[in-house]
Amino acid sequence: MQPRETLVIDIAKLKTHGMMGYSGAVKNLFGVVPGLLKPELHSRYPEKEPFAEMLVDLCEYVHPDFSIIDAIDAMEGDGPTGGQKRFVGALVGSESPYEADMVGAKLIDMNPEEILVLKNAQERGLCAGKLSEIEVLGDDFENIVVYDFKRARSSSIDFTTRVPKFMQPLAKRILTPYPKINTAQCVGCGKCAESCPQHTITVREHKTHIEYSKCIHCFCCHEMCPKHVINIKRFSLFDL
């Protein structure tokens, strides 16, 4: 580690994430982006792969000296704000945010290859290609892996790439998870509309409405809703 005038320590909470599936050391650095610029970046990179590439670019720019993932009490389900607390009982620390995330992902029984930021970093040669290539000190984390950790509903396998190209727009419209407002509990505060990068959300008569034809499925509304009344819905077959 080269000496620097400023020491950057990245402290993240291990969570599931509605858009990216997993949130740890790398995704946490999106927090350095000023508030109003976040929706702009979501709008500029509406698809998961380009967004993941942007997160890796950001990580390389910030270049944290040390990354810590708090996985003592993690969040499962529809994170990063609408999930439930789940005890894992671990702290992960590394000079590499990517390798910290590889271990963090394993703790909740996620394959690092499923996580797009790690896949992108591995393709660039920024971290180990496999978890077995990382020297892990301390407790044997294999003994504390939570195998029934609930994932975000939107992070299901993307089947749209498995159909013929001409059918993908229709398949995406049918199969892609989407935000659904519980209008009975919505208080019309407008926080979701403020956070929406595509300006698809309006508040009328103290109730929120989404214009789904313009929705890019970034789930910023789900993340920012202070009342947690915006849920992530998906094709019902995934729940069978």
State each model region's role:
Residues 181, 191-209, 220-236:
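Iron-sulfur cluster-binding cysteine motifs and their immediate structural context
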Residues 216-217:
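Extended, alpha-helix-rich binding/interface surfaces that flank or overlap catalytic cores
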Residues 1-182, 236-240:
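Extended, low-polarity segments enriched in aliphatic/aromatic residues
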Residues 185-188:
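Flavin-dependent oxidoreductase catalytic cores
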